[in-house]
């Protein structure tokens, strides 16, 4: 471009200027100047307004997002209400056992090997659930089962595999070397045939009753072995003086357990030798022996909260000083606790709610304890409060009873810790451990009266799960998972999708030990070899957005 062209563009010949009108002023400014300033202000204000509106929209979006975040973490008081106390720092890992496993039992030997017993199989993991192998003996142990149970003696490390053979008898086999070799008795159910709902446990000998015999037999086996079962109208309990090889001492427990049908939960024992059996009855009750099963007495509690119908097993755990903790599902479907500090002679009568009020339906409470006041409870539960009052499987307004739960109810696995359960104002720390449901819809809680057959019977989970701690005070949980595969990934799974019974183990990775001396347990090293299948699943302790919980 030439200089002349530039001059022609920039210069105006004054002779050719024509004024159409005389400019007027607005104050000290000309009209043109005022208009320019007004346009600038308009643009500036619109920019500011846009920024404000955008910020408001962003904040609204952020608030909306926070409202649907579900942490699955609760800290509650003795009424189940939230309190302003920091939650315990803990994380759980899970592991698929790879086998069907309704009614599982779990135990841990001093070597760290985990034994998961369900149906006729004994599954062992010595690498904290990275891998599992079947270890029961094909000759010494039962090839089939009608009802399974397992137990690891925390004193001797003996592993018991108990299998009911029809209703006639039970076949018990045992191992003293982490399942490498086994011995068994195919007719090991006491002096009287016909048994059901079998349970086994071990505990110290006392100085009275059968303990007088046990004191002489400790060279044969250090602890007493108890075997209880239901037979028609009552509970029968036997005591073995030879490590469970035979059960010659004992018989029927008389009293309330007999008059109410006799179904019962797990056997529990305390360091002082006290034995507890929990009958499945309307008023929460514990049957107690302080002489190794020679005699029994019963104690009731929980009349302020009652029990639902149909009802499942309650359970007792005991701590290192023989304090006892009885947990059960109340009539309002919460998990409740009564405590005894005198070996079962007396129990607190004002029931304590263990589960958060947000968990409105529960089943299968299982418990274990470490040092005084330090115990854990696991259970299945639902937070679908919005479904309360909707039509249940019988067409009545649903009140939280899992037996009649509508199809939209999702049950998850929970664990609750307390480190001060003996205090007047205990604190409960609860975590939801599953990110997809364990069961969708109703759980059959009465074997002769299942209400749903969508996709098959909803009796798939059977009667119980299990929880035990190891020598470090680390919590291990065994469950049957009814919602696996496609069911676990669907946005809206149905009851028909939820008919599995896959064995799953949940284990405290890091967090508080139930033994004070061990403090907070560090993470477990679960490094898997390259040829292992993906059975080990870390449960990441982060907030997750899900649609199957209520606000």
Per-region residue spans from a language model:
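C-terminal PAP-associated
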Residues: 61-551
């Amino acid at each position: 471009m030439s200089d002349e062209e530039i001059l022609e563009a920039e210069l105006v010949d004054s002779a050719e200027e024509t004024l159409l009108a005389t400019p007027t002023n607005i104050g000290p400014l000309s009209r043109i100047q005022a208009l320019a300033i007004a346009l600038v202000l308009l643009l500036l204000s619109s920019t500011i307004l846009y920024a404000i509106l955008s910020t408001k929209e962003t904040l609204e979006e952020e608030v909306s997002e926070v409202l649907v975040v579900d942490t699955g973490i609760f800290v509650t008081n003795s009424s189940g209400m939230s309190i302003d106390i920091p939650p315990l720092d803990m994380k759980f890992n899970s592991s698929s056992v790879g086998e069907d496993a309704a009614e599982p039992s779990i135990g841990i030997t001093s070597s760290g090997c985990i034994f998961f017993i369900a149906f006729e199989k004994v599954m062992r993991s010595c690498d904290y659930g990275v891998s599992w192998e079947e270890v029961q003996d094909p000759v010494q142990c039962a090839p089939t089962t009608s009802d399974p149970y397992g137990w690891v003696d925390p004193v001797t490390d003996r592993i018991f595999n108990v299998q009911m053979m029809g209703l006639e008898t039970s076949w018990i086999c045992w191992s003293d070397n982490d399942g490498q070799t086994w011995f068994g008795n195919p007719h090991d159910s006491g002096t009287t045939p016909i048994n059901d709902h079998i349970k086994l446990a071990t505990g110290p000998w006392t100085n009275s009753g059968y303990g007088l015999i046990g004191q002489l037999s400790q060279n044969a086996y250090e602890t007493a072995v108890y075997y209880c079962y239901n037979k028609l109208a009552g509970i029968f309990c036997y005591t073995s003086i030879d490590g469970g090889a035979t059960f010659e001492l004992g018989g029927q427990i008389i009293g309330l357990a007999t008059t109410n049908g006799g179904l019962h939960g797990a056997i529990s024992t305390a360091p002082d030798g006290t034995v507890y059996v929990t009958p499945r009855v309307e008023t929460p009750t514990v049957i107690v022996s302080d002489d190794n099963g020679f005699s029994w007495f019963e104690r009731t509690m929980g009349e302020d909260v009652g029990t639902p119908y149909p009802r499942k097993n309650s359970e007792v755990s005991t701590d290192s000083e023989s304090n006892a903790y009885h947990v059960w599902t109340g009539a309002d479907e919460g998990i409740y606790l009564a405590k005894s500090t005198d070996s079962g002679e007396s129990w607190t009568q004002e029931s304590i709610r263990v589960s958060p009020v947000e968990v409105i339906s529960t089943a299968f409470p299982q418990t274990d304890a470490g040092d005084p006041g330090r115990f854990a409870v696991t259970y299945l539960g639902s937070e679908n409060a919005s479904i309360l009052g909707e039509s249940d499987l019988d067409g009545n307004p649903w009140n939280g009873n899992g037996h009649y739960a509508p199809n939209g109810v999702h049950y998850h696995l929970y664990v609750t810790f307390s480190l001060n359960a003996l205090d007047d104002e205990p604190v409960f720390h609860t975590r939801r451990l599953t990110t997809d449901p364990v069961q969708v819809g109703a759980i059959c809680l009465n074997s002769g009266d299942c209400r749903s057959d969508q996709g098959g019977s909803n009796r798939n989970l059977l009667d119980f799960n299990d929880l035990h701690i190891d020598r470090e005070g680390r919590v291990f949980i065994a469950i049957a998972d009814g919602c696996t595969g496609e069911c676990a990934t669907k946005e809206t799974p149905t009851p028909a999708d939820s008919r599995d019974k896959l064995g799953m183990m949940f284990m405290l990775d890091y967090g508080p030990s139930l033994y004070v001396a061990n403090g907070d347990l560090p993470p477990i090293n679960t490094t898997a070899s390259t040829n292992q299948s993906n059975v080990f699943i870390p449960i990441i302790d982060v907030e997750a957005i899900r649609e199957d919980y209520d606000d």
